[in-house]
A protein has these predicted regions:
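Glycine-centered tight-turn and secondary-structure capping sites
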Residues: 35-40, 80
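FKBP-type peptidyl-prolyl cis-trans isomerase
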Residues: 6-14, 39-47, 70-73, 84-99
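Well-structured core secondary-structure elements of compact alpha/beta domains
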Residues: 1-34, 50-65, 95-99
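Charged low-complexity stretches with an acidic bias
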Residues: 67, 79-83
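Soluble sensory domains of the PAS superfamily and closely related sensory modules
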Residues: 74-78
Length: 99
């Protein structure tokens, strides 16, 4: 397994909405992805992270750079695949591993 990966994500935060609203929003984004919508475009439209303007691209990162729940999910993904919703202290993430 590589020491570094590259991934993009979509964050639906729990600072600006309730946890239930965030769950509903992330489920809608998952549905849009399953309908064939582009991950980067959905990140630009819906992500609460500044990386959203870059299609959710987080660049390359190694272990220890992200919160544990995010890191585990990202490193467990196959290249080209997208996670289910991952809950962290920031909210709900969809992670797409690109490298």
């Amino acid at each position: 397994m590589s020491d570094e990966i590259r991934a993009s994500h979509i964050l639906v935060d729990i600072k600006s909405r309730s946890k239930e609203e965030a769950k509903t929003a992330i489920k809608k984004i998952i549905s849009d992805l399953n309908d064939g919508n582009d991950f980067a475009e959905l990140a630009r439209e819906h992500s609460d992270c500044p990386s959203g303007s870059d299609g959710g691209d987080l660049g390359r990162f190694g272990k220890g750079a992200m919160v544990p729940e995010f890191e585990k999910a990202a490193f467990d993904l196959e290249i080209g695949s997208t996670s289910d919703a991952v809950e962290t202290s920031f909210g709900y993430h969809l992670i797409h591993r690109t490298e």
